C-alpha cells in the first residue's frame, strides 16, 4: 500500500498537479486482526473496525497537524465542496473539515461519534453505536446492549451495560444516541421495538 500511495503521489508531481490537489488517505473500515478472537471486518462496533485513519494533505494548509476531534467519513463531501469554494447543499450530512487543516476546531463541533451497521435483511446483526471520549454505548436491538469505559478499558473487554451502578450512564448515552438518530434521520425505530435489553429501559422520547 505504501508503494502504491507513493506511485499516486509521484504521478501527481510528474503532472504538475501537486500544488492544486487535495490528497486524502482513509478507509471504509478497519480489520480485527485477531482482537476479540475475530478476523477480517465484522458486524461489531469495536475500535479496530471503526477507528479508521484519515490523513489529508492540502496545498496552502499547515503541515504535520494532528487533531483528536470526532470526525466521520460523511464530513469528506462538505470538505471537498468547501475546498472548491462551493456551498454545501442543505440537508447534506457532515461538516467541512477545512478549519481543522489549520488546527482550528469549529465552534459547536460534535462531542461524540456515531456509527451504524444495518446488518442483514434489515434486522439480523443490526446495531448502532455512539461514543464520547469516555464512554461507548452500543445498541443491539436483538442482542445484549454494550457499554464500555474507553478510558479505563480501551480494549473493550468489560461490558458494563448489565451493572446497576451504570444505569445512569446508559440513560445519558441513550439520549446522545437519540440525538444522533434524529440528525442522521436513521429509520431503525421503524424496524425495532426500541427497547434496550438492559433493565427494560426504553429508547424513547419519554426518557428525555
Predicted segments — roles?
Residues 51, 72-83, 96, 100, ...:
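Generic recognition of well-ordered alpha-helical segments
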Residues 127-144:
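Low-complexity, glycine/alanine/valine/leucine- and proline-rich hydrophobic stretches
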Residues 6, 59, 68-105, 152:
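Non-catalytic, well-ordered alpha-helical segments in soluble enzyme domains
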Residues 1-2:
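Outer-membrane beta-barrel transmembrane strands
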Residues 10-72:
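Histidine-centered active-site microenvironments of extracellular/periplasmic hydrolases
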Residues 162-208:
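Long, internal low-complexity/basic segments
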Residues 111-115, 195:
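WW-domain-binding short linear motifs
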Residues 5, 23, 28, 53-54, ...:
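Generic structural signal for small/hydrophobic residues in well-ordered secondary structure
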